[in-house]
Amino acid sequence: MIRLIFLDIDKTLIPGYEPDPAKPIIEELKDMGFEIIFNSSKTRAEQEYYRKELEVETPFISENGSAIFIPKGYFPFDVKGKEVGNYIVIELGIRVEKIREELKKLENIYGLKYYGNSTKEEIEKFTGMPPELVPLAMEREYSETIFEWSRDGWEEVLVEGGFKVTMGSRFYTVHGNSDKGKAAKILLDFYKRLGQIESYAVGDSYNDFPMFEVVDKAFIVGSLKHKKAQNVSSIIDVLEVIK
C-alpha cells in the first residue's frame, strides 16, 4: 500500500515562514511511510527551499496547481512533460507574463499591487516575509498574487478575461484554468500505476477545496467547512488520526 499525503504549506504545514516547526511533522510522516507531496501556491523556488530544509525529495505542485515538478527518474516509467533542470514538468497553467500583461491594464484603474509591480521592500511589508525569502517568491512562473487594491471589480474583469482568481490563506491569486485538485489527480494516477494507494490532503483555505475532492481523506485546518474534510486545529491533530 502506497500512502500519499498532499500538504499545503502556508498556515497548514508552516505557521509563518520558518521551516523548523515542520521538521518533526515531516519526520513523523516519513516514519509512517508517507510519500509527502507539497501542493501549494508557493513558487518552485520557494518550494525548493522548503524541500531542502525539510529533506523532502518527492514530486511537488506549484502555484495553485499550475505545474507539477517530478524529479527525473522518480517513476519507473516515462512521464511526458517539459525537461527543466532535474525535473520533468507538467504545465497545467499559463505563463505569468500573460497574467501580468492583463494586470498592467488594470493596475491604475483598480489600484492593484502585486509581485510584478512591487519592490522587494513593499513585498516584505505586504507579506511579513523574511528578506532572504522575498526573491524566491518573486520567481513566479504561472501566477500572480494580489496584495491590495483601491477599487472592487477587478476580480470580475479577470474572470471574464479567462483567468481564475482564487482566495488563499491571506491573498488572492490570479492564474490560469488550473487548481490543486487537477494536479493532484494527475499525480495520483501515476502512483496508481505502482500499486494500491491511500491518499490524504491537508489544507486551510478555499484554494485547497479542489484537492480535497480527489483524495480518500481530507483535513482542513481551522474553521472553514468542506463536505469531505474533517476540521482540525492543527496538522498535529492529523498525525493522530492517520497513524
From Swiss-Prot:
Q: Name one GO biological process term.
A: mannosylglycerate biosynthetic process
What are the record's GO terms for cellular component? cytosol
Which reaction(s) does the protein catalyse, per the Swiss-Prot or TrEMBL entry?
2-O-(alpha-D-mannosyl)-3-phosphoglycerate + H2O = (2R)-2-O-(alpha-D-mannosyl)-glycerate + phosphate
Pathway given in the UniProt record: Carbohydrate biosynthesis; 2-(alpha-D-mannosyl)-D-glycerate biosynthesis; 2-(alpha-D-mannosyl)-D-glycerate from GDP-alpha-D-mannose (MPG route): step 2/2
Which keywords does this Swiss-Prot/TrEMBL entry list? Cytoplasm, Hydrolase, Magnesium, Metal-binding
Binding residues for Mg(2+), per the UniProt record? 8, 10, 169, 204
Q: Coiled-coil regions in this chain?
A: none
Which cofactors, if any, are listed as required?
Mg(2+)
Q: What are this entry's molecular-function GO terms?
A: magnesium ion binding; mannosyl-3-phosphoglycerate phosphatase activity
Which EC number applies? Answer: 3.1.3.70
Gene3D superfamilies from the UniProt entry: HAD superfamily/HAD-like, Putative mannosyl-3-phosphoglycerate phosphatase, domain 2
Name where it's found: Cytoplasm
User: Which top-level group of life is the source organism from?
Assistant: Archaea
The record, for PANTHER family, names:
HAD SUPERFAMILY HYDROLASE-LIKE, TYPE 3, PHOSPHOSERINE PHOSPHATASE
What is its biological role?
Hydrolyzes mannosyl-3-phosphoglycerate (MPG) to form the osmolyte mannosylglycerate (MG). The enzyme is absolutely specific for MPG.
Q: Mind telling me which HAMAP family this protein's record contains? A: MPGP_rel
Record NCBIfam families:
HAD-SF-IIB, HAD-SF-IIB-MPGP, osmo_MPG_phos
What's the protein name? Mannosyl-3-phosphoglycerate phosphatase
- Could you tell me which species this protein originates from? Pyrococcus horikoshii (strain ATCC 700860 / DSM 12428 / JCM 9974 / NBRC 100139 / OT-3)
